[in-house]
């Protein structure tokens, strides 16, 4: 779905708050990029996608190129009337520092809107359809039954069982 500008989970209000407190601005990684859309675009995506297809389709707004989070942070610092505090600031406390916190578990440096290359256009010029493969519910029930029947599974046995399920579901699709 992308990052919705101005929403409660958006990085923009967080950066604004961090700047208003004098910094630092926290960023996970210097090369991190994300896609953004406005609240209006997100609302329109939901409405338009609902009118285009059926319930099994996955739709994504064409949001253009990803945005560098570091560049966004720097721009917000400058637009707020501050300067960027760097290691060359020599003790000058007048700038806003950027600190890198590291990626959280499961977080990626570059956001992906699609998995794979199965992307097609729709009747709406800004909405794309992703043809994603997913397994049948019967396969999910099968693995759940296997998991329920196995008491006190070791982490390794659980990993092997889930890996086998992933391999089996891939072969059944092809």
Show where each model-derived region lies.
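Strand-loop microenvironment adjacent to phosphate/nucleotide-handling motifs in alpha/beta enzyme folds
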Residues: 1-174
